[in-house]
Amino acid sequence: MGGEQFEQHDDREGPLELLQSLRSKATELLLREEWEESIQVYTKFIDLSRSQISKLGGSDPDPDPDLIHKLRKSLCLALCNRAEARAKLRDFVEAMMDCDQALEIESTHFKTLLCKGKVLLGLSKYASALECFKTALLDPQASDNLETVTGYMEKCKRLELQAKTGAFDLSDWILSGFRGRSPELAEFIGSIEIKKSETSGRGLFATKNIVAGTLILVTKAVATERGILGTGGEKAQLIMWKNFIEEVTESVKKCNRTHRLVSILSTGHDEDNLEIPDISIFRPDEAFETCGNSKQSLDTEKLLSILDVNSLVEDAVSAKVMGKNKEYYGVGLWTLASFINHSCLPNARRLHVGEYAIVHASRDIKAGEEITSAYFDVLSSPLEKRKEMAESWGFCCGCSRCKFESLLYVTNQEIRELEMGLERGVDAGNAVYMVEEGMKRWKVKGKDKGLLRASYWGVYDEIYSSERLMRRWGRKIPTMEVVVDSVSDVTGSDERLMKLLVEDVKKKNGGCSNITEMEKILKLGKGFYGKVVSKRKAMKTLLGLE
């Protein structure tokens, strides 16, 4: 890494000695992984090298061509090393500029091509990264690093395939017990578009029919912050929030594209007049040319409003954290996922894997239907409770479930009596029986039954989980399978629905189940975890059936 030694020449001795000293210091800092400090020293070395090359090539009446050549080679290497340090700090735009400047000096410089390929990978530019690694193979040094280069090439091909097809599979990672680092994933956008939402500002909408479990999008975080809250939860959260704001601010400063994507997010005000962006600007390959250091700073007040409205907690009611990060409290900003609005009839869930949010359909979605998730618990939550939770989030839900229950609540005294009975602690069996008999009298049919069963899921769960209550009420109420089907049909797959079925299977015949029961559980599992778990054994492991 240190490059060639400079010969010492009479009046040039001072600057050349300084260059040698700067290069040694920068190399030492790079090896010690002190990225910021190494960047500072490399910058001094680069500026002085350019000054010396300019002086030797211009005003010097007797330039030394060998010295100029050595200076240029050292400058190329210094730019490459500074790019490497910048990439470690995720300053990919500046790193790319350094790589391009180094390649202007030596277009086939192996180390720079390798570095540029890795930077392009960091920018989710898989095809361009592959071309870099292919060019690097032409260098004689590639023979000593063949395994490394071919490894990167295979990664590019795998990620490019994921980005184009949405063919992700986490099965092997799951079966390993989440050993090692989280898998590196590609960014992916499925059959969706951004449109004006009838319920709240802008939203994501399906452009084709989407089957339950199908990937909708995979997106990398602008920034995340994680930690263990412990006993001082509130104080720890405030520290995390401060760090998170600083990380987002830094990311916005480093890249025009990030600045643009964060700037168009909602601040919670003037929702009706917000720009409707084209989905293509969220594709890394489409927007790459707009990258560069942001000359504009995002107004602090606006940024805080954006983060307040759009930040996502990883371990949320509609999300599941996979791998080692599930041990931590985490918050992050995923720009495209921020367009997903709330509904009490959600059709999407997300998984968090490393820095990525993976959004999939939790039930079948029709073309033209809005992609929604639950911001709060919509099971065991009657209308009034959901209204309170929506208010705490700062909005009023106008989904079809809320409209249906509002009408029923206004016109039916029995519903109000039922809720008062639940508050007094009425027997779960009685409560379920009252709901089921009431639906017959109120002429509630089809999917609407699932809406009310979801609202009073707590008492259904209690009765189906109790052998004593089932002996008493089992013949008077619908079977567990019927109720689970009707609830999942309207609210999507939920961990509690799966758990009930799994526990029931474990009670029967020592955990043996028939094909129909197993397929029902696996179908719910697909809606909960998505089709990123293709191996049956991996899904059964997640469901606690292995």
Residue ranges of each PLM-predicted region?
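Alpha-helical protein-protein interaction scaffolds
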Residues: 8-165, 435-528, 532-533
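A eukaryotic intrinsically disordered, low-complexity regulatory tract that is acidic and Ser/Pro-rich
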Residues: 200-204, 219-223, 228, 529-534, ...
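C-terminal SET catalytic tail plus cysteine-rich post-SET Zn-binding segment of SAM-dependent SET-domain
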Residues: 15, 24, 144-145, 152, ...
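Ankyrin-repeat-protein effector appendages
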Residues: 140-198, 206
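Eukaryotic beta-rich interaction modules
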Residues: 19-31, 39-46, 79, 186-208, ...
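Eukaryotic intrinsically disordered and solvent-exposed regulatory patches
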Residues: 12, 64-65, 71, 99-100, ...
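SET-domain substrate-recognition elements in eukaryotic SAM-dependent protein methyltransferases
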Residues: 123, 173-176, 197-200, 207-351, ...
